[in-house]
Amino acid sequence: MGAIGAAGCEGLRERQIGSLLVSHEDSSRDDLPSKSEFLVKRIRRHRSKGSQSYYSKFVRNYLLGIRKTATKLASACNPRAEAWVVIQDSWYKDLQIRTDVLLEELFGEAGWSVRRKWSFKVPSSLSELAATTHGWRDKSPLEEHVLRFERT
């Protein structure tokens, strides 16, 4: 798949759809890499209702799950194995979340290196459907990313 190119990435992006599972485990003692931890702290300190009690915990568990996945993949793969990830930037209220940067850090910690990254402007986002978001930010400047990691 190393020679997939931008056109091949379009097909990969079109076939991807994800869902989130919410864990109720207490993950407050688990360390995250610096950029992930910084995001969780920003969400926890946000003035919006539920930021401290729910959303910061949800995001922490989500990021820990990504790290766990990257670590398990690394342990199951030989050096030079590839992992391809399609992910879209996101928002928490008025905070833009650069998911590509977070994934690079989480996968890097688990023994993966980014070999190539394609970024695509996203003309709209599902988060724009919520009427309450319009007061928080302008039209979505989000990007979707295809990251090709290699096991080091």
Protein language model regions, located:
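S-adenosyl-L-methionine-dependent nucleic acid methyltransferase catalytic domains
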Residues: 1-152
